[in-house]
Structures are given as structure tokens and as C-alpha cells.
Amino acid sequence: MKPKNTICLWFDKDAHEAARFYAATFADSEVTAVHAAPADYPGGKKGDVLTVEFTILGIPCLGLNGGPAFRHSEAFSFQIATENQEETDRYWNAIVGNGGTESQCGWCKDRWGLSWQITPRALTDALAAGGGEAKRAFEAMMTMKKIDIAAIEAARRG
């Protein structure tokens, strides 16, 4: 059964390539359907890949090849909770190493401009602790691109 709510992501013309990358990068992710355009349209021609149905960590998504009219921005991002540094590094390196760019505080962009927050649970736990622990962890996070869990835990301890 199709979900009632699906995230639709607009791509210029690379939705299928992006969906395959996400499926290969994240667990519980797969490309579930590819649909060709039944006729010419402003972003392409009949027979081109128009939409791609896929999941990212179980979240249903639809990639739409709509042409260059709209770009992704930081106003929308996927936040990926990681359990340890190895998982954090794996996701970060996959995204940045495949033509993406680093940002600050655990944020990065993939080669299609989609924003990702690679967020260790150790960081969210530290921020939720409140008080001095949260302040020190927050200040440490503000100096980082990719989150360093050992540095966050050291800052949390003071």
C-alpha cells in the first residue's frame, strides 16, 4: 500500500542516480519504482525518467526530474541519527566523498544540493542534558564540520 505522506524531492534530471546513491548508502533504503514520462514536458521528453520512488532509512520519497527551475536549500534536510563515530564517518564520507560539500555543525550537502545533518546520538543526548554539559557540548559542536563524538563527550564532561 502506498503511504499517505511522501517526501517529494525536485531534481534537474538526476533523480534516478540520486535515488540509487541513497539506496546504496543508507540501510533500509531502496529504489522501488522508476516511471517514464508519457509525453514531452518542460523538463524533458517522452520516455525520460520522470519520477523515481525510493526510501531513505524507511522514509518514502519521490524524486521528480523537473528541470533546473528549483534548487534544494538548507530549509529542508534529512537528519540522520548515528550510533557511533564509525557510522558518522561512513555517512559523512559517502556524501562528501561523492561530490558533496562540508558545512558546519554536522551538516553537509550531497552532489545534488540536498542537505544532510549527520548527527550522533551522543550529541543530541549531550544537548538534551541541559546546563553546563549542554553548553560545553554546544560550544564544541559550533567549531566542527563533521561531528567528533570523542570531542563532544570530552566537552560534556568539562
Please report, for each region that a protein language model flagged, where it lies by residue.
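Short loop/turn microsegments at loop-to-beta-strand junctions
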Residues: 6-7, 49-50, 103-105
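Core segments of cupin and vicinal oxygen chelate
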Residues: 9-58
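A generic structural micro-feature
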Residues: 44-50, 70-72, 133
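Vicinal oxygen chelate
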Residues: 11, 15, 25, 56-60, ...
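A charge-rich, low-complexity, intrinsically flexible signal that marks solvent-exposed coils, linkers
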Residues: 41-43, 74, 157-158
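C-terminal cap/linker of serine protease catalytic domains
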Residues: 132-158
